[in-house]
């Protein structure tokens, strides 16, 4: 029985804000790709119907943690539909490598891994579509991790079209700050009227991120990290930050730059992959 479950990072290879709805949510167009790097969840089934998170996250109550919320949500829905074997529960612990507030999707990825893993371990039999629908109630980025394939996203991020962008090597850098998403989306200077374009058009254009100008303006650490990376390769913000990344054609080129990273920058090299490491394990 598999007990170690990948919870990979994602990059937004581009991110454009195309509008704002009456409910305050922003509409966007973005390109998600996974990294062969991330957290690892250790999940052991229990037979007493209890969910225990054995590695609490500092500053987050266990019941508020997306890991626990995802487990309880699956338990509730599977139970109500008669698909939860009696006594199903789990002990869950996490090896955390992805920073909070980094734009790498750590919390969303954790939630998706829990949904996929427990559906498998408990033998609930929910489809990927059902799991993705559950995931959306936990966060807009959860469905792409549940579905497990690189995707072009529209709407508020919930309309996904599978795509296969080039699988490049990336140097990903965390500048030491955490950026809450609302800080970026509430900024009055955030571009909110980027024209909508087709997938084909966007894939042929130079990639960029509408949130980058705000993150650089408000967080000097992000600005400094991007300024350094741009000396070596095309670089930009992922999500709403704080992580930034540079793209390379080979691992060796990325690692040569990593060796020159300033001490204040926490950085790693990873490959972009179109099939999630989580789903690769399940094949």
Swiss-Prot record:
Name of the top EC class for this enzyme: transferase
One annotated GO molecular function: 4-(cytidine 5'-diphospho)-2-C-methyl-D-erythritol kinase activity
Active site: 10, 141
Entry keyword set: ATP-binding, Isoprene biosynthesis, Kinase, Nucleotide-binding, Transferase
Gene3D superfamilies recorded: 3.30.230.10, GHMP kinase, C-terminal domain
EC number from the UniProt entry: 2.7.1.148
Pathway where it operates: Isoprenoid biosynthesis; isopentenyl diphosphate biosynthesis via DXP pathway; isopentenyl diphosphate from 1-deoxy-D-xylulose 5-phosphate: step 3/6
Residues reported to bind ATP: 99-109
Transmembrane segments: none
Example GO BP: isopentenyl diphosphate biosynthetic process, methylerythritol 4-phosphate pathway
Catalytic activity field: 4-CDP-2-C-methyl-D-erythritol + ATP = 4-CDP-2-C-methyl-D-erythritol 2-phosphate + ADP + H(+)
Sequence similarity: Belongs to the GHMP kinase family. IspE subfamily.
Function: Catalyzes the phosphorylation of the position 2 hydroxy group of 4-diphosphocytidyl-2C-methyl-D-erythritol.
Assembly with partners or alone: Homodimer.
NCBIfam families for the chain: ispE
Name listed for the protein in its UniProt record: 4-diphosphocytidyl-2-C-methyl-D-erythritol kinase
Lineage, top ranks: Bacteria, Pseudomonadati, Pseudomonadota, Gammaproteobacteria, Enterobacterales
Name of the gene encoding the protein in the UniProt record: ispE
């Amino acid at each position: 029985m598999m007990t170690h479950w990948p919870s990979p990072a994602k990059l937004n290879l581009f991110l454009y804000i195309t509008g704002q709805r009456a409910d305050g949510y922003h509409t966007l167009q973005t390109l998600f790709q996974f990294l062969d790097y991330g957290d690892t969840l250790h999940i052991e089934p229990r037979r007493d119907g209890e969910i225990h998170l054995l590695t609490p996250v500092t500053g987050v109550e266990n019941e508020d943690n997306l890991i626990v919320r995802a487990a309880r949500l699956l338990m509730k829905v599977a139970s109500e539909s008669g698909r939860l074997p009696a006594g199903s529960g789990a002990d869950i612990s996490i090896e955390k490598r992805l920073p909070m507030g980094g734009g790498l999707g750590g919390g969303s990825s954790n939630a998706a891994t829990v949904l996929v893993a427990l559906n498998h371990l408990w033998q609930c039999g929910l489809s990927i579509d059902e799991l993705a629908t559950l995931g959306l109630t936990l966060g807009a980025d959860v469905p792409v991790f549940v579905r497990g394939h690189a995707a072009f996203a529209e709407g508020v991020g919930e309309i996904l079209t599978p795509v296969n962008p080039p699988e490049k090597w990336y140097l990903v850098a965390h500048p030491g700050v955490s950026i809450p998403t609302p800080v970026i989306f509430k900024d009055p200077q955030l571009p909110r009227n980027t024209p909508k374009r087709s997938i084909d058009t966007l894939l042929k254009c130079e990639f960029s991120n509408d949130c980058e100008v705000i993150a650089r303006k408000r967080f000097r650490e992000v600005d400094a990290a991007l300024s350094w990376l741009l000396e070596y390769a095309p670089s930009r913000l992922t999500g709403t930050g704080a992580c930034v990344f540079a793209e390379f054609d080979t691992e060796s080129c990325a690692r040569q730059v990593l060796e020159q990273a300033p001490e204040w920058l926490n950085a790693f090299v990873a490959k972009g992959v179109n099939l999630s490491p989580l789903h690769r394990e399940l094949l």
